[in-house]
Amino acid sequence: CLILSENRPYWLISDIAVMNAGGISVPIFTTYSSNDYKYILNDCKPALIIVSSNELFKKIKDYINTQEQKIISFEEIEEKSLLIKDILDETNYEEKINQSLKRNMPACIIYTSGTAGNPKGVVLSHGGILSNCEGAVELLKPLTKIKDPIFLTWLPLSHSYEHTVQFIQIIV
């Protein structure tokens, strides 16, 4: 499931929902070139595309097959899509969690920024993400003593570091 969005709460909801359902989340940068989008879409072949806005949808529309790929959007877009707010209103989340997930199963594919050729996809397992979170929580233990800690993050959520930090904010 490809996620193309700027940082916003629906991004986090989408990412966690895909991974909890047993899908593979593929967050990508909003700043890629047209060639990068084309390459990534051809490389990972997502069955589902989550996009935040019509502006971002226009960046990828020439490289997707709307007959084969379902689209979920955060806002109305020019193509037929499901709106995330409608899905959230109608979903029983407990039923959607894949109870058979294992630590060694793929959870997401993080693509590099592509500064040296085509972006490279790195597969992260559920266990790899959990290990990163466990290590970060250990480092951030002093923050757990603060009531309602505040985090300031600025990297795109599709960045490998920020992708981990999003989970730490929930844990801490």
Report the location of each language-model feature:
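Conserved AMP-binding A3 loop
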Residues: 107-133
